Amino acid sequence: MFRNESGGFRIPPTVIIALVMGAFTLCKYYGQSSVNDITGETQHISMSPEQEIAMGLQSAPQMAQEMGGLSSNQQMTSIVKQVGQKVVQNSAAKNTPYQYDFHLLADPQTINAFALPGGQIFITEGLLTRLTTDGRTLNEDMLAGVLGHEVGHVVARHSAEKMAQMELAQGLTGAVTMATYDPSNPNAGYIAQSVANMISMKYGRGQELQSDNLGVRFMLESGYQPENLVGVMEILKQAAGPNRTPEFQSTHPDPENRKEAIQAAIQEWKGKLGK
């Protein structure tokens, strides 16, 4: 606040603009809400499931190309697709509107799996070849755990949710930058952006844990042993090595903490499903 010539207070125009920007951003975000039939959560999402599907289908070819292309190993590709479809067709995921397809990427070094909006799911050869209990034979329960986790991201609409959250963060960051603009302090914008980044990181960690929980549910519903998802966490831990990024600064929770949450989810869903 600043005093005007008459001794009263006036609000700087930049603050007024910032307040309007912030109010508009918040109204837009909270005005778009729907209940997720699988998770039961109220989500603030502007995209429709049809838009998510279209976005995923459009992005899939480019994503595969950036990751070294699709694998030429037809046998392993077939297994990935079969296990993925078994998880979907025998779980609550079947009752969602998404078009699920499972792809094996040729990258032998990167240990990763991810989902695009609408049901396009990828796993690298680098991760697939590590999903073994004896160093040689593929453990399909582990594969089901990885794919079930990614199906969880799709079902929970995490990509669409993330986009809405990023729009919210960007809108509020713009408002804060406008309100705190000071030509003599060029760091003000950097501070505002840092806050937005921290918000995004927090959401990502929560979404990963929710996908672990859903992955356990889908494994049980489709006849796989969810205890093997704990084994996947051990593989990820070993692959990361001793110099892992501290959990708070990582988008993904630490594998050790994920193992604890998965074990709790196993007991939760075995009770709910009567397994």
Residue ranges and their predicted role:
Residues 1-275:
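A Zn2+-metalloprotease active-site environment signal
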